[in-house]
Amino acid sequence: MLKFTEEHEWLKIEGDVATVGITNYAVDQLGDLVFVELPEVGATFSKNGNAATVESVKAASDVYCPLDGEITEVNPAIVADPSLVNSDPQGAGWFFKLKLANPADADGLLDEAAYKELTA
């Protein structure tokens, strides 16, 4: 199941784990990324907590945790090469995996149609 937030994060949810990254729209707004800081594995976040930071040639921006949960994995490839986020934001450019405290909370996020409407 693919979900989106109004803060331009995407979530690919499989069971009680969500892979999280930033959307194509966010990447377009930021420009070329030059730095990514990810959370620690095992860290817990509340919804909308500041989980990661990205810096681009234009600005620095926070990446928010879309739902309550615990970080189970991070993507070290994007720390070594932030351009992966630019080239494949919803694939190889994922940020972290989040074990959801309450998977049903994902129902309150945007579906693809609603997100496209938000960014139109």
UniProtKB/Swiss-Prot annotation:
GO terms for cellular component: cytoplasm; glycine cleavage complex. The modification N6-lipoyllysine is found at residue 58. GO terms for biological process: glycine decarboxylation via glycine cleavage system. It comes from the Bacteria. CDD domains: GCS_H. Its cofactor is (R)-lipoate. It holds the Pfam family GCV_H. Keywords: Lipoyl. Binds 1 lipoyl cofactor covalently. Residues 17-99 form the Lipoyl-binding domain. The glycine cleavage system catalyzes the degradation of glycine. The H protein shuttles the methylamine group of glycine from the P protein to the T protein. Belongs to the GcvH family. The glycine cleavage system is composed of four proteins: P, T, L and H. HAMAP family: GcvH. This is Glycine cleavage system H protein. It comes from Rhizobium etli (strain ATCC 51251 / DSM 11541 / JCM 21823 / NBRC 15573 / CFN 42).
